[in-house]
From Swiss-Prot:
<feature type="region of interest" description="Disordered">
    <location>
        <begin position="1"/>
        <end position="20"/>
    </location>
</feature>
<keyword id="KW-1133">Transmembrane helix</keyword>
<dbReference type="InterPro" id="IPR003593">
    <property type="entry name" value="AAA+_ATPase"/>
</dbReference>
<protein>
    <recommendedName>
        <fullName>DNA translocase FtsK</fullName>
    </recommendedName>
</protein>
<keyword id="KW-0132">Cell division</keyword>
<keyword id="KW-0472">Membrane</keyword>
<feature type="region of interest" description="Disordered">
    <location>
        <begin position="735"/>
        <end position="757"/>
    </location>
</feature>
<dbReference type="GO" id="GO:0007059">
    <property type="term" value="P:chromosome segregation"/>
</dbReference>
<dbReference type="GO" id="GO:0051301">
    <property type="term" value="P:cell division"/>
</dbReference>
<feature type="topological domain" description="Cytoplasmic">
    <location>
        <begin position="184"/>
        <end position="757"/>
    </location>
</feature>
<dbReference type="InterPro" id="IPR018541">
    <property type="entry name" value="Ftsk_gamma"/>
</dbReference>
<feature type="transmembrane region" description="Helical">
    <location>
        <begin position="30"/>
        <end position="50"/>
    </location>
</feature>
<dbReference type="InterPro" id="IPR036388">
    <property type="entry name" value="WH-like_DNA-bd_sf"/>
</dbReference>
<dbReference type="GO" id="GO:0015616">
    <property type="term" value="F:DNA translocase activity"/>
</dbReference>
<dbReference type="InterPro" id="IPR027417">
    <property type="entry name" value="P-loop_NTPase"/>
</dbReference>
<feature type="transmembrane region" description="Helical">
    <location>
        <begin position="61"/>
        <end position="81"/>
    </location>
</feature>
<feature type="binding site">
    <location>
        <begin position="443"/>
        <end position="448"/>
    </location>
    <ligand>
        <name>ATP</name>
    </ligand>
</feature>
Length: 757
């Protein structure tokens, strides 16, 4: 009996053990299936749950969320197939962990430098972005290496700075590869050295084989020529030699130099006769361009409210269209820095004009201050409805320059403007524009735009490559640039001297065209190429021509003082200066036809319009409406040459402190060397008595009548036209009357005294 009881108790124990094993394996299978499901749903981002899993993975490992979810699938598969937990801290797995940690550290270091800024709090800034991404998946975007990357980087960056952090990341990756592959670090580097030697020897063998093949080909050609009969050799070779002689490079270049030698003598003689300004002849090799880091990084603006508003507005738009019987749907939405653009695709048979006519109703439905409708969007079968954001995201000049998709260092006149509605960095090449008109109401962002253009050029071009002439009648906007080596002359602030400065630029343009005609070149680029060839072959070096950018900050004031001289100079420069490498940037507050005349508009094809008060002003600038609906504070419409419709841009902001930093950096590199011939002459003061005995009587008459004209003096004093005109000119020089203003009467600057009355 005792033996039977022992047997039954042993069976019970074995059965309970097997049951425990079965339940444990069952739990492992369930866990494995759950891990596989989480990984697959997260990787494919299936629905709200999938996006949530993916965002949760991004929260921990950022850009490597795919690796984490793939690891979840692999771990789950192992648990289902093997029905046991893997050893999570084996040698190879530890190596994989180290590789992942190294990549997370490197990725988050890159994220800090390019997105958060070097001075940002790493953990707190990342935590904010991660939380926002968790609750709004696929809307925040790149979050670096997640919280794990942020935790490691915050420690290493504090202790070892940027270079040390990157070094730690590389060492972690190398050691991880060593653990995974089972190769020691010494063997790892020796393998790399062997591979480099192998590539070097392969390349050497390939070049030797190439030489052998070429030698065999030459030998075959020589054999073919020998096989030909002697009579044919003489007949064929002589013409061949005659034909092949000219294309030889050495003979051709020497022939060119022989032909152009007398021309150079003429040029040097002509240059002695011309009054040319003494520019910097050659490159200053010590000069270094200012780094982009000198500008302040962009501040991150929270636009989370805008995402919520987009869905609400899209629904309101579709309901509004439906209530007016218009069949249309919202196909795409672009959230920009200051404006959100809704792309509306109308159904077949719906007129575009019908949607445009609903602009007031759409503004009412969206409770928007104002909306702008782009109908249709160029290159798309859709209509754009632009609605202002609740919070405007600031666009800094630094972020536009850093995210430039077409960054070419050779383009010295590439300027940064801002970001368009889709968030793309907007750049423009001034040499292709080739002249630019900037207009808008006061406080709309013109001066910041001009400062951004000048700073963009200073960051790209050295003083011998680009020169500038600045005219600032307001005396406060451009004075900060006095002393930079790029200036041809100090900033011109006297409106009367401004016309003279423009005339000197016209004279420089004519001098350049004279040089082109004597060298047989067509433009500045061709002339500079010619000078480079000349300098390579001659000891006497000739200077290359720099670009010249003429910046006029307030055209309206100049047109009031000397409209005829200013308009003539601007017209001549706009018509002819492009090939000479001279480009105009003209800014004005008052976009009226008296200031922006038809002749000026016809010759300045590229325009930038800031916010204006009426559609008439918008038509004066752009020849179309739209600028009256802009928001101000840098909101602009760019109409480049060759474009039929303008592009809406949020202008890049540049503070006064940033401008001063760039100017101080440039001046520290090189001092200004002004050209005496380009500095406007001092306006001589009128001295001495007037010889005409009628002058004082004429002044009394003009002051009494409070009007001045040549015909009035002719009638009152019974004198000829020439004498009356001289009297008026004398009064203008002495400040009694103002300048000639077209059909308007001259302004009398002296009031009638009470005693005279």
């Amino acid at each position: 009996m005792a033996t039977q009881k022992k047997k039954t108790s042993g069976r019970k124990k074995s059965s309970t053990r097997s049951k425990k094993k079965q339940s444990a394996s069952f739990r492992l299978e369930i866990t494995g299936v759950i891990l596989i499901a989480i990984g697959v749903i997260g990787l494919l981002q299936l629905g709200f749950v999938g996006r949530g899993f993916f965002a949760l993975a991004e929260m921990f490992v950022g850009l490597l969320s795919y690796v984490l979810l793939a690891g979840s699938v692999i771990l789950g598969g192992y648990m289902v197939i093997r029905r046991k937990m893997p050893h999570l801290f084996s040698k190879r797995l530890v190596g994989i962990y180290l590789i992942v940690l190294g990549f997370l550290t490197y990725i988050h270091m890159y994220f800090i430098i390019h997105n958060l800024g070097a001075n940002a709090s790493v953990v707190s800034s990342t935590w904010k972005l991660v939380l926002e991404n968790l609750f709004r998946p696929n809307q925040v975007g790149f979050v670096g290496g997640g919280m794990i990357g942020a935790a490691i980087t915050s420690i290493t960056y504090f202790l070892l700075d940027r270079l040390g952090t990157n070094l730690i990341a590389v060492l972690l990756i190398i050691y991880g590869f060593s653990l995974v592959s089972g190769i020691s670090i010494r063997q790892f580097f020796s393998k790399i050295a062997e591979f480099v030697r192998y590539l070097f020897t392969k390349g050497k063998v390939a070049t030797e084989k190439g030489k052998e093949v070429k030698a065999k080909r030459d030998k075959k050609k020589a054999e073919k020529i020998v096989d030909v009969e002697p009579d044919e050799v003489i007949d064929v070779i002589e013409p061949l030699q005659e034909e092949k002689t000219p294309p030889i490079i050495s003979n051709f270049s020497s022939k060119v130099e022989q032909e152009k030698a007398p021309v150079e003598e003429k040029i040097s003689q002509k240059e002695q006769d011309l009054e040319m300004f003494q520019q910097e002849s050659f490159e200053n090799e010590i000069y270094q361009l200012p780094p982009v880091d000198i500008l302040a990084p962009a501040k991150v603006t929270d636009q989370s409210k805008e995402y919520d508003q987009i869905k609400v507005n899209a629904k309101k738009l579709e309901d509004t269209f439906e209530s007016f019987g218009v069949k249309a749907k919202i196909t795409q939405v672009h959230l920009g820095p200051a404006v959100t653009k809704y792309e509306v695709q109308p159904s077949v048979g719906v007129k575009v004009s019908k949607i445009v006519s609903l602009s007031d109703d759409i503004a009412l439905a969206l409770a928007a201050k104002d909306i702008r409708i782009e109908a249709p969007i160029p290159g798309k079968s859709a209509i754009g409805i632009e609605v202002a954001n609740q919070n405007v995201a600031m666009v800094s000049l630094r972020e536009v320059l850093e995210n430039n998709p077409k960054n070419n260092p050779d383009e010295k006149l590439q300027i940064a403007l801002g970001r368009d509605i889709s968030g793309e960095a907007m750049m423009a090449n001034l040499d292709k524009m080739p002249h630019l008109l900037v207009a808008g109401a006061t406080g709309s962002g013109k001066s910041v735009c001009i400062n951004g253009i000048i700073t963009s050029i200073l960051l790209r071009a050295k003083p011998h490559e680009v020169k500038m002439m600045m005219i600032d009648p307001k005396m406060v906007e451009l004075n900060v640039y006095n002393g930079i080596p790029h200036l041809l002359a100090p900033v011109v602030t006297n409106p009367k001297k401004a016309a003279q400065a423009l005339q000197k630029v016209v004279a420089e343009m004519e001098r350049r065209y004279d040089l082109f005609s004597h060298t047989g070149t067509r433009n500045m680029q061709g002339y500079n190429d010619y000078v480079k060839k000349h300098n390579e072959l001659n000891e006497e070096k000739q200077p290359e021509l720099p670009f010249i950018v003429v910046i006029v900050d307030e055209l309206a004031d100049l047109m009031m003082v000397a409209s005829n001289d200013v308009e003539d100079a601007i017209t001549r420069l706009a018509q002819m200066a492009r090939a000479a490498g001279i480009h105009l940037i003209i800014a004005t507050q008052r976009p009226s036809v008296d200031v922006i005349t038809g002749v000026i508009k016809a010759n300045i094809p590229s325009r930038i319009a800031f916010a204006v008060s009426s559609s008439i002003d918008s038509r004066t600038i752009l020849d179309m409406g739209g600028a009256e609906k802009l928001l101000g504070r840098g909101d602009m419409l760019l109409l480049p040459v060759g474009s039929s419709k303008p592009t809406r841009i949020q202008g890049a902001f540049l503070s006064d402190a940033e401008v001063e930093d760039v100017v101080n950096y440039v001046i520290s590199q090189q001092k200004a060397q002004y050209s005496e011939e380009m500095i406007p002459d001092d306006i001589p003061e009128v001295e001495g008595e007037v010889t005409d005995e009628l002058y004082h009587e004429a002044v009394e008459l003009v002051v009494e009548m409070q009007t001045a004209s040549v015909s009035m003096l002719q009638r009152k004093f019974r004198i000829g036209y020439n004498r009356a005109a001289r009297l008026i000119d004398e009064m203008e020089q002495r400040g009694v009357v103002g300048p000639h203003e077209g059909s308007k009467p001259r302004r009398v600057n002296v009031e009638v005294s009470p005693e005279h009355e």
